[in-house]
Each structure stands twice: as structure tokens, then as C-alpha cells.
Amino acid sequence: MVEALLSGIVLGLIPITLAGLFVTAYLQYRRGDQLDL
């Protein structure tokens, strides 16, 4: 029961974490491109 709950949380968090990393990397790329860093 606990393992299923933990695996569900992990499987739910992985796409959110990946999406957050992609968004932050994209925003940093856009910001760096605009500020010409």
C-alpha cells in the first residue's frame, strides 16, 4: 500500500519536475538571448 502510494507520487512528480526544468531552461535561454549574455 505504501509502496503503491510512493510510486504514484514519484510517477506524478517526474513529469512535473521535467516540465519545470524545461520551462526554467527555456526562460533562462530566452532571457539570456534578450540580454545578450
Swiss-Prot record:
Spans traversing the lipid bilayer: 5-25
Localisation: Plastid, Chloroplast thylakoid membrane
Question: What molecular function does GO assign, one term?
Answer: electron transporter, transferring electrons within cytochrome b6/f complex of photosystem II activity
Q: Which InterPro entries match?
A: Cyt_6/f_cplx_su5, Cyt_6/f_cplx_su5_sf
Which Pfam families would you find in this protein's record?
PetG
Q: Name one GO biological process term.
A: cytochrome complex assembly
Which cellular components does GO assign to this protein?
chloroplast thylakoid membrane; cytochrome b6f complex
Q: Which UniProt keywords apply?
A: Chloroplast, Electron transport, Membrane, Photosynthesis, Plastid, Thylakoid, Transmembrane, Transmembrane helix, Transport
Identify its membrane topology class.
Single-pass membrane protein
Q: What does this protein do?
A: Component of the cytochrome b6-f complex, which mediates electron transfer between photosystem II (PSII) and photosystem I (PSI), cyclic electron flow around PSI, and state transitions. PetG is required for either the stability or assembly of the cytochrome b6-f complex.
Subunit: The 4 large subunits of the cytochrome b6-f complex are cytochrome b6, subunit IV (17 kDa polypeptide, PetD), cytochrome f and the Rieske protein, while the 4 small subunits are PetG, PetL, PetM and PetN. The complex functions as a dimer.
Family membership, please give it: Belongs to the PetG family.
Could you identify this protein by its name? Cytochrome b6-f complex subunit 5
Q: Which organism is it from?
A: Physcomitrium patens (Spreading-leaved earth moss)
The uppermost taxa in this organism's lineage are: Eukaryota, Viridiplantae, Streptophyta, Embryophyta, Bryophyta
* Primary gene name: petG
